[in-house]
UniProtKB/Swiss-Prot annotation:
Keyword Transmembrane on entry: yes
Protein name, UniProt field: Kelch domain-containing protein 7A
The organism of origin for this protein: Pongo abelii (Sumatran orangutan)
In-chain residues carrying the UniProt-annotated modification Phosphoserine: 77, 356
Gene: KLHDC7A
Compositionally biased residues, Basic and acidic residues: 104-118
Keywords: Glycoprotein, Kelch repeat, Membrane, Phosphoprotein, Repeat, Transmembrane, Transmembrane helix
Recorded coiled-coil stretches: none
Region of interest called Disordered, as start-end residue ranges on this chain: 35-210, 304-352, 371-395
Pfam families linked: Kelch_1 (PF01344)
Subcellular location: Membrane
Membrane-spanning ranges: 12-29
Amino acid sequence: DWHLDMQLTGKVVLSAAALLLVTVAYRLYKSRPAPAQRWGGNAQAEAKEEAQGSGQPAVQEASPGVLLTGPRRRRSSKGAEAPQGCSCENPRGPYVLVTGATSTDRKSQRKGSGEERGGQSSDSEQVPPCCRGQETRTAVSGNPDPPHLPRLGSEPNSSPAGLIAAADGSCAGGELSPPQDSKPPEHPGLGQLEPPHCHHPAPLQGSSDMNQSWVFTRVIGVNREEAGALEAASDVGLTLHQQEGAPNASYTFSSIARVRMEENFIQKVEGVEPRLKGKVYDYYVESTSQAIFQGRLAPRTAALTEVPSPRPPPRSLGTGAASGGQAGDTKGAAERAASPQPGPSPSTRGFSRKESLLQIAENPELQLQPDGFWLPAPPCPDPGALPGSGRSSQEPHVQLVAGTNFFHIPLTSASAPQVHLDLGNCYEVLTLAKRQNLEALKEAAYKVMSENYLQVLRSPDIYGCLSGAERELILQRRLQGRQYLVVADVSPKEDSGGLCCYDDELDVWRPLARLPPEAVSRGCAICSLFNYLFVVSGCQGPGHQPSSRVFCYNPLTGIWSEVCPLNQARPHCRLVALDGHLYAIGGECLNSVERYDPRLDRWDFAPPLPNDTFALAHTATACAKEIFVTGGSLRFLLFRFSAQEQRWWAGPAGGSKDRTAEMVAVNGFLYRFDLNRSLGIAVYRCSASTRLWYECATYRTPYPDAFQCAVVDNLIYCVGRRSTLCFLADSVSPRFVPKELRSFPAPQGTLLPTVLTLPTPDLPQTRV
């Protein structure tokens, strides 16, 4: 809905520009010298001819003392339409202001005015009921000076400044009091002024709708001299429509700007043949836009919709439209129009354009509310008050951006972690934050995406719309932080298990999470990918049935989930992460390999191990974009798999005949740990490119326990049931750290180490 809000507020800017345009045109016209030729008694006839030449209908003929009615101007508001046979426009229409009349004409005008008033008052009783509103305005039109139009001076060359100042009054804000002197205008002329259409709703009993219209009108300049005429008007309308008890609201915005200028270059007409008399410039701009907002409105909206729905035809503000009486009461309407009126009553609903903008800015319910997220409201004694309604630096404000007004949502870095976001609206919120340049909101959207990276990766509506830099950004933010050694204690006998992390600074073990009962199995394998912990099941239940289920743990949210299962069960397999994929290698009596694509959430078969070799009790690691497999049933063999070429190579493993316990990769080197009952632990190293093995370190201990390894930076942790060793994988002098670390507390089953990046305890998490 942001483009609807831009259209709505853009009309206000258009109206302001129209006002400036017509003001400059009026000043330029006034600076031109006017001819001294005065028009005689044929002024009305020439006015008709000029109106016909310019495409405008001629004004109606009436007595000189009565303001003549002419063609009705189109109205931009479409909220209410009049029924057939009853005009909903202002019956006064364009007014004809005549200048340069003689004293004899003035007397006849006064006399004709009185006769006309008498005729109108007597005929007002016979008006059909469908035009009662028009009858009231016709009776009032007998008054020489309408309530909302000033009376011109008695001098023919009087300045129009007084007229402009009087016409500049707020037509929608109230009624202007008529002058005490009720004399008719003494200088009839040919200048035409279209009065602003003041839409003021009349109360309607039994209506279930609540409508309200505001029209902000400003007459820029009205002037008529002997050689030309200038008229300019600008209307701005805002209509609010809301069904009673319904959450939807409709806003209709209309803007009209019109400038008309007449020029006459012929000072003296010779002959009766038709000739060029002058030029007519007519500029007319009308625009209408409508916006419908869905959602609940705050109680403060009732202050704007307390007026009942308007009843067509709407009455002019000068005839007492705010009164609750009948529109057909001609006598009462005439008395109200003729008597001096005080200031606008409190019940009169009138606003200027500035007040309307300020009211929209102070009422967030009238602004564009992004769906799907909310901002927490500060503690406030008034439960009906909305956040941002107070006078502070955080209140909504209007900013001019590329010529259009936008309402900014206040958001600070402190409130960013409290923003309610989810995967359904995070991309829309990110788009809004980019458009409004809200850094805190943008960071919050990136945070949600990084914390739920797998879900974002599988959603084409989110991940497919992100740029390459944004995809890398949310992944790197997920991997930012401190890496910890995480060990899974899997005890199939007790059908329980848990995760613990090791703090090397304090040399303590801390519990992290519990394993779900479905993930506890014998011969399972674990691995980390994108800072997620994946667990591939082994054999479950009392009968040790092989299972193909795969589970996933998100350490940033603490949520366990189940992903796509394997195509076949693989107890005692090895799980390796390479190039954003998981590889399940071997298993009991298996030489096949499966690859998991996290974006598609699917397992596919990869090229099997060469020579139909079964891999059991083996070890595997990834180094230099290749997978290396050795140990167990693959004694004296080293298999190498290229993910780019999708093929395996077999080669000699080298080293001794001792049993290989583990093999890991650090900084382009492979480290293999062999166990010897009498000598202890021997470490062999080779480069991934040269594949030349040599012994680099030893750890002398009799009867060493079996262990498994995990790499944190350049430290290799060897985690066993009774001890935990640390090996420094230095490129020059690799060695064991002399200090023995604290062992895993009370192990219940098999210990499976891995590495995860964990959030700090004081870091607030976004609610998902």
